[in-house]
Amino acid sequence: MDHTIFIWNVWSRNEKKACMLNFHNAAVKDVKWSPQGHFLLSCGYDCTTRLVDVEKGLETQVFREDQIVAVIKFHPDNSNIFLSGGSNGHIKLWDVRTGKVVHNYNRNLGPILDLEFTMNGKQFISSCDVSQSNISENAIIVWDVSREVPLSNQVYAEAYTCPCVRLHPFDSIFVAQSNGNYVAIFTSTPPYRLNKYKRYEGHVISGFPIKCNFSLDGKKLASGSSDGSIFLYDYQSSKVVKKIKAHDQACIDVAFHPIIPNVIASCSWDGSILVFE
């Protein structure tokens, strides 16, 4: 909320703060590493997305919008393009080489909550805040990237919004964190059906923007919870395999280490970050 991005040295017991970036003029909403790890992409309440060369500590590009930018996502195969979504419900595909919008995705949506590319990068999934009247049509939409059209807009008919969508690293499914206190499962190929017989439940959302993430091998799903706990689910059985009491306030995100499979990091509504082994 203080406009700052911190890069932390996970293993250092002394100099844990490796770098501090101050390029935004308002609170930061989302931060993503580029696939090669040389750049950081960040967005926020100043209605911009900013690309920073981490090694040089220099801002290389600014992408301006007429909305608070809430979520950003690099393309899985082409790090020169990324998606952005914001408070006005606008979704844009940007090219970092030109600094211009390549595609616009418009459908009178509410604020965008999350974005996720499919495995081949030809489609993406959006989740947005919706009114009760159109919740079955717009809560989760699968889009065609190049044609700018929805491939399916009635994926999730429950009366809940979904603050997080995540693609499985290998299987043809994606999951959505539902405000109904469960993680729903969908096929990531047409016709994008909800699995009505299996879900991940046990954690509590309580209106917090709580995220979930798959392990690198796809065998586990981790979710935060409003009671400050981390829930680890078995992917196949959907059963809770471990519950860790991590924070005093809501645990809003959990991430697996990109190389070391038994290391996870979590963050809390109170601003604290923990690493578990």
Per-segment meaning from a language model:
Residues K16-C19, L58-Q61, V102-H103, L151-N153, ...:
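A structural motif specific to WD40 beta-propellers
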Residues M1-D2, C43-D46, S84-N88, S127-V130, ...:
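Conserved strand-to-loop turn within each blade of WD40 beta-propeller repeats
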Residues I5-N9, C43, T49-D53, I72, ...:
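WD40-repeat beta-propellers
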Residues K17, A27, Q36, E59, ...:
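WD40/WD-repeat beta-propeller blade-loop signature
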Residues G37-L41, R50, E59-Q61, N78-L83, ...:
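Structural hallmark of WD40 beta-propellers
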Residues A255-E277:
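Blade-level signature of beta-propeller repeat domains, shared across WD40, Kelch, NHL, RCC1
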Residues L21-V28, F63-V69, N106-I112, V155-C162, ...:
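WD40/WD-repeat beta-propeller blade N-cap
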Residues V31-G37, K73-S79, L109, E116-K122, ...:
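Loop/turn segments within WD40 beta-propeller blades
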